[in-house]
């Protein structure tokens, strides 16, 4: 688990979207919406987790430089894949949609 300081730093790195409150709404690396208060909520289409860009199984560490916010289904789909991986959720306007598994 990550402490609040790390969670906040990772959130701050997520993509801001014009005309949306960046304190509440951002997008992950796959283009899926995430909501700040939905951290760790796998029962939400807007839930997110902290992803290790360079997977721990390949020697990636917990330094913030190697961490990013990722919609939870995209994080599951990515798993230990690096550098290429597949997304399962992307945005369509202001909502998230299931896309199968698209190459990112």
Indicate where each model-derived feature is located.
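Substrate-binding/catalytic groove segments of enzymes
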Residues: 17-19, 57, 78-82
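Short Cys/His-centered divalent metal-binding micro-motifs
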Residues: 63-94
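Conserved small/polar residues in nucleotide/adenosyl-binding loops
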Residues: 102-104
């Amino acid at each position: 688990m990550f402490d609040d300081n790390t969670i906040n730093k990772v959130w701050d790195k997520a993509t801001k979207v014009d005309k949306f409150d960046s304190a509440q709404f951002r997008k992950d690396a796959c283009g899926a919406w995430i909501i700040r208060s939905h951290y760790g909520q796998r029962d939400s289409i807007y839930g997110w987790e902290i992803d290790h860009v360079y997977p721990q199984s390949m020697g990636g560490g917990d330094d913030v430089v190697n961490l990013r916010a990722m919609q939870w289904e995209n994080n599951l789909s990515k798993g230990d894949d690096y550098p290429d991986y597949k997304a399962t959720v992307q945005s369509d306007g202001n909502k998230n949609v299931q896309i199968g598994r698209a190459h990112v």
